[in-house]
């Protein structure tokens, strides 16, 4: 069994690092700080989980989620929105686009880890 692949999409390097630290386990990480970079990395890396902020340079995290949902090779990826600025309408739009979960910033490391673990178990 291979290490689960996690793509962390956030324009704040410190937050990306905190997410990596929170996710203790057999994980392989890639990071992206713009929407375009997130899409490029997802296409190459084929992540199992994508942690994505809604507010990113070059568009919205929703663009990343929609890209994953539209690509048969990436549809399996569990998308977790990790965002501080999310109205209920944003969350509904994220769910409709394909997001599986939401974790608010500032995030609780245990909540983030449990959310990722539950999505990985669901998909196995």
Show the residue positions of the predicted features.
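Acidic catalytic/metal-coordinating carboxylates
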Residues: 34-37, 60-66
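The C-terminal output helix
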Residues: 117-124
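Two-component/phosphorelay signaling modules centered on CheY-like receiver
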Residues: 13-30
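C-terminal output helix
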Residues: 107-116
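Acidic, metal-coordinating helix/loop segments flanking the phosphotransfer/catalytic sites
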Residues: 31-49
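The feature encodes the CheY-like receiver
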Residues: 57, 75, 87, 106
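Alpha4 helix (beta4-alpha4-beta5 surface) of REC/receiver domains from two-component response regulators
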Residues: 63, 86-103, 114
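Active-site residues of response regulator receiver
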Residues: 53, 83
């Amino acid at each position: 069994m291979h290490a689960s692949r996690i793509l962390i999409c956030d324009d704040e390097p410190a937050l990306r690092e905190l997410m990596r630290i929170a996710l203790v386990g057999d994980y392989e990480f890639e990071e992206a700080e713009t929407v375009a970079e997130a899409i490029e990395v997802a296409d190459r890396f084929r992540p199992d989980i994508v942690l994505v902020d809604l507010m990113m340079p070059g568009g919205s995290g929703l663009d990343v989620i929609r890209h994953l949902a539209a690509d048969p090779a990436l549809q399996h990826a569990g998308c977790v929105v990790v965002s501080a600025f999310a109205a209920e309408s944003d969350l509904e739009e994220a769910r409709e686009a394909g997001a599986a979960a939401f974790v608010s910033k500032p995030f609780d490391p245990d909540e983030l880890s449990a959310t990722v673990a539950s999505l990985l178990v669901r998909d196995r």
